[in-house]
Amino acid sequence: MQQQSLRVLSIVLALTAGISCRELLADDGLLPPVTAPIVNGIKVPDGFHVELYADDDLAHDIHSMTIDSKGRVVVSGPGYVRILIDSDNDGRADSFKQFADKPDTGSQGMFFLGSSLLCSGDQGLQIFRDDNQDDIADGPPQVFLKISAGGEHHVHSIQKGPDGWWYVMAGNFAGVTAAYATVPTSPIKQPVSGTLLRLKPDLSGGEIVSDGFRNAYDFTFNGTGDFFTYDSDDERDISLPWYLPTQVFHVLPLSNAGYVTTGLKRPGSYPDMPPVLATFGRGSPTGVTCYRHNQFPEPYRNALFMLDWTLGRILAVPLTQEGSGWKKDGVVFGEGQDQFGFAPTDIEVAPDGSVFVSVGGRGTRGSVFRIVWDAAQLPTVSSDGDSTTRQIDTVLDAPQPNSSWSRAEWIPLAKSLGAAPFQQAASMEKRPASQRMRAIEILVEVYGGLDRATASKLSLAGSGLVRARTAWAVGRSRPEAPDTEILKKLVSDRDPFVQRFALEALSSATSAASFTTTISSIAAALASNDRSVRFSAALLVSRMNDDHRNALAKALANNLRGLMWFHMGRCLRSPLQSVPSAAVALSVLTSKDASAEDRYDAVRILQMTLGDVGPAKNRPVMFDGYAPALSLASIERELNPIMTKVAAVFPSGDAHLDHELIRLIAMTRPFNRDLFSRLLTSITDSTLPADDIHRLAAISQFEIERSYDESVATAQALLGIDIKIRKY
C-alpha cells in the first residue's frame, strides 16, 4: 500500500513538473522508452505523435501487416513474411526473423492462430505451420481455399470473427462464384463482384455473407459485432454521373454494396443499399481496424480507422449509435505532409494501445510507423473481488479481442474457467454492457452458443445492446434453425437496434419454420420508421418460400410503405418484372402525402419492379445505368399508363428525385416528345457536366426522330461538356 501511495504521489509530482505519463509508463516497462525517431512528415491531431518503428532496410514494399500471438509486428511483401524484432526494447525494430520466403506475390492479409499463419497469396488462402515454434515456417504452405490471389483486386484480408468463424474479404476479380457457398446456411448463393466470405472454424466449408463490393481491401468488427469496410472508387469515372467516391460501409448480412459494372454503381442513397457511414472522395482503400483499446482518448475509442494509399491518409469514423445503426461521420485523422512519401497499406492496434501503420505497395519504400497518444493513462488493475472474479474481468475486458495477440491471452483463461461464470456475467445487470456482450460472444465461440434458458433470460435484459447481442448469439448458435420464439420477440423489440440484429439472425436460416413463426414480426419490421430495420427485413424475403411471401403481402395490405419495401425485397436476389408490384411503388411516388424520402425510395423501387437497369449483351457499358436489364416487351401495354403518371411528376423540383426519375424515364424508352424536350431544355450553361451527361445518356434512349433544332441542341450540349469540365 505504501509503495502504491508513493507511486501515485510520484505521478502527481511528475505531471506537475511536465513529465508525461508515457515516460512513467516507460520507466515501469509498460511502454517502450521514447528513443524511436519522431516522424514529422505525417500530420496527426494535437496530442499525438508518430514514431518510426522500422524502415525499408528491414522490410521493403510492405503489402500487409499483422501482430502475432506474441505481440510482435509481422509484415509481408513479395517473397517474404518477416517478424520484426525490437531486441533492446527501445521502441524501434533493429532486426527481423524470416518466417517464410513466400508468398511470391506477397500477402494482402495475415492472421496468426497460435504459431501458425493463415494468409492470402500465390494460389489462394494458405496456412504456414510452425509446430516447433521456432518462428520459422516448418515447410511450404498448405492451400486451404483456392481463390485468385496476389493481384490488387484479388483475395485480401482474413480475420477471426467474434463467433470463432473465419471472415475473408475478396475483391471483384477474385473469382468468387456460387461454388464458394458450400454450406446450406450461406446467406448468398449467387455472388456478384467483391465478397465477404465466412468460413467454418475448421475451414471445412464456407458461406458468402455480403457482396457487391468493388475492391474492399480490409474490414473490421466493432464492439457490437457489426462489420465495416472501406470500398474503392473508380477514379477513371471522376467526371461522369456514375462515379462514386470511396465509401465506408456498414455491412449487413445478405446485402449487396452496389458495384455491378464499370458503368453501373448504385449510390448509397438507394433503399436497396447498405448504410454508407462516410465518403472520402478519390482514393485507394487499404487497411481497416476498429480501435477497441484504451490508450487513445475519446472520440477515437471504438472508432473505425481506415487507410487511403493514393492520397496518403489515415481516416477515422467515430461510431455513435443512431437508431438501428450508426451516425454518418468521418474525419481525416492523419496524412503525409511536406512531400513526405506516405503510402499506407495496413493498420493494427498494438498490445499497448498504440497503433502501427505500414507503408509500401507497387514496389515502393517499406516502413512501419507507430502512432502514440502523448498523455497515455496508466493501466488500472482492479483489486476488488477474488481471484476468479479478477480472471473473469480480465477475459471480458481484453482489448482488441479478435486479434491474434489478445486471443492468445484470453482464450486459455476462458477455457479454464468454464461456461458457468460467463453465463452468470452475461446475466448480471450491474455489469457494463460491454462486458455482458463479450460474455455472450465467449459463450458462442468457446462453449457452442447460448442454451435456451440463458437466451430467454437475456432477451429481457435492460440493456438494448445486450438484447441485440443475444439476438446475434441465437442466430450464430444454430444458424440453420435459430430459436424463433426468442427471435420473434426480439424482432418486435422496442429498440430498433435490437430489431435489426434479430432480423440478421435469420439471414442464415434454412428451416421454413423459422419464417413461419416470425412472419408477423417481419411484416411489422417492413413498415418500421427505421430505414435499416426495413432494409434488414426486406433482405430476408429472398430466403422465403411463396407461402411466406404471400403471408407477408397479406399482412401489409393496408400499409403502402411496408408493402413497397416487401416488393423491393422480392427483387433483391432475382430479377422481377411485375406490374402489380410497380403499381404499389407508383402509388407512393404520386402520393401528395408521401415524404420526400418515401418518394425517392419509390422511384428506385419502381425501376427494380420493372426489371431494373443493367448490362446487356452488345450494349456499351456506359448505358448500363440507363437501359433496361430485361426486355419490356411483355409489359408494354401495362407500362404506358404507368409512364404517363411518371411523366406528370417530372420535373418534381427535387433534384435528388429528378435524377432517378430521369433514369426511370430512360430505361422505359418512351415515345414521348414532350419528355424528350423537357430533358433537352434542362441542359443549360449553368448545369454541371456530370448532370449534362446524365441527361444526354437518358435522351439517347428515346426512340423518337429528332428535329434539326433538337439535333443541334444535343450536339451543342455534348460539345459544352469539355468546356464545363475545364471551367469547373
Identify the role of each PLM range:
Residues 24-405, 409:
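Beta-propeller domains with acidic blade repeats across secreted/periplasmic ectodomains
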Residues 430-432, 462-463, 494-495, 529-530, ...:
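Short inter-helical turns and helix N-cap capping residues of alpha-solenoid HEAT/ARM repeat scaffolds
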Residues 419, 452, 483-484, 515-519, ...:
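Core helices of alpha-solenoid repeat scaffolds
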